[in-house]
C-alpha cells in the first residue's frame, strides 16, 4: 500500500504542476494589468458599460472597494436566504432560514468559508443555491485573488502609492480566470454523471420496494466553482462523498486538482511578476514539502487504523469508517489533506471518523493559517506573511535590516504581519474556550472526552481560518454556535485582509534596493528550510497545548 500511496501523491502533484504553470502565466499578465490576448476590446466596452475608470487606487481605496462589495453581498445573500420561500425556483417549497442560520450562512459564503450548519437538499431552494451561494463562490474567490494581486504589486512596484484598480481586477479575475475554468470543469462533471437541471425531486422505488426521493438541481455548475474557488460548500449534506457531487474516481481526482490549481498557479505568477521565477518556486517547494509530509502521516494513520477493529473481529484494522468504498482509504486521506491545506473544506469522507492522528493533521493544517497552498489568493498572501516573519528572524540573527525582493521590512510592516498572523490563533483559542465554558457550547457535543473537545476545536479552527469542514459530531445549528462561528469567520477573513492591505500600501511606496553580498537569498534551500521552520514553529507553539487535550490525548488512550 506504500507504493500505491507514493504513486498517488506523485501523479497528483505532477498533473497539478503541468496544469498550474500555464495558468500562472495568465495570472501574471493580470497582475501586470495587461489584458489577456483577444479581450482588450471587450474590456473597454465593459469599463464603459459599468462605469469603471482606469484610475488606480491606493491601499485604502482598494480595501474600501473590496469591503463594500463583500458587505453588500452579505446583505443581499442574507435577504435571499431569509425570504427564500417567497422567491422563485423552489419546487420543494422550502421555507426561509432562521435569522441566526441565515446570518451564519451568508457570512460563511461571503468569507469563502462555506461552513454549513444545514443540509443543502432539505434547506435551500435552487434560487438560493444559484443566485446566492454560487454567486458568492465566484465573488469571494475573486476577492482573495485581488488581495494577493495588490500585495504582489507592492513588491514589484516602487516609489508609487497605487496598487491597481480593484473593480478592474475583480472583473478580470472573474471573467477571464474563474468563469472559463469553472465552465470546463462543470462540463466534465456533467459528462461524468453529475446532475445539472431544475427538475423537482424525483420519487423512486428501490429494489427492496422502499420509497425514496432523489434530490435534483444545478449541481455541476456549483460544484465546479466550489472546488476551483476553494469554497467547499456542498450542494448536498454529504458534500463530495455524495455520488451526485462526486460520482467517480476521475471526478475525485479532478476535484482535488481544481482545489490546488489556482493556489499553485499563483506561485508561478508571483515568480513571473517579481522578475525571478525562483522566488515563486521557493514558495511552491516549501508548500509542497509540508503537504507531502502531512499526506504521508494521514495515510499511515488511516492504514494502521484502530486496533479495536481487530479485537472486534474485523478482517483488517484499516480505518474505512466514514469513507466511500469507491475512493478507498488512500484517496480519502489525500482528499482530506488537500481540502484542509487549502481553505476549501469540501470532504469526500467524514473527518470525524478518522483516527486521532489522521484527524489531527487536517486540523493542524487549518490552524497554521491555511498557508500550505491555501485558499485562492489567501494561501499565498498568508505564506508571504510568514516570509516576512522569516526574513525578519534571519535579519535579527545576522544583524541586518530585513528585506525581501529588495524592499526593506520596517517596524510598520512587522507590526501588521504580527497582527495578521495572530488574528486567527486568538479566535481559535478564545472561541474554543468560550464554547467549553458555556452550557450552550457544550450541549452541541455528541461525544465525551478528548474527541468531544476535538470536535469543538476543529469547528472553531475551521471557521476562523475560513475552511468550512467539520467534525460532524458537533450539532452546530443553534443560535450560540451560528453567531460564534459567524463572528470567527468574519474576523478571520477581514481581520487578516486589512493588515495585508496595509502592508501592501507601505511596501509599494518604497524603493527597491539592489542586492549586495550580505543580502539573504530568498530562493535557495536554506531559506526554504527557514520558511518551513517558521511556519512549523509558530503553529507548534500556538496550538500544541490545545491539541494535547484533544487528538493527542485520544491517540494515547488507545491500547
Swiss-Prot record:
The system is composed of three essential subunits: KdpA, KdpB and KdpC. Part of the high-affinity ATP-driven potassium transport (or Kdp) system, which catalyzes the hydrolysis of ATP coupled with the electrogenic transport of potassium into the cytoplasm. This subunit binds the periplasmic potassium ions and delivers the ions to the membrane domain of KdpB through an intramembrane tunnel. PANTHER family: POTASSIUM-TRANSPORTING ATPASE A CHAIN, POTASSIUM-TRANSPORTING ATPASE POTASSIUM-BINDING SUBUNIT. Keywords: Cell inner membrane, Cell membrane, Ion transport, Membrane, Potassium, Potassium transport, Transmembrane, Transmembrane helix, Transport. It is a multi-pass membrane protein. GO terms for cellular component: plasma membrane. The keyword Transmembrane helix applies. The chain crosses the membrane at residues 5-25, 27-47, 63-83, 132-152, 170-190, 253-273, 283-303, 327-347, 356-376, 379-399, 416-436, 484-504, 524-544. NCBIfam families: kdpA. It is found in: Cell inner membrane. This is Potassium-transporting ATPase potassium-binding subunit. Pfam families: KdpA. Belongs to the KdpA family. The keyword Transport applies. One of its GO terms (molecular function) is P-type potassium transmembrane transporter activity.
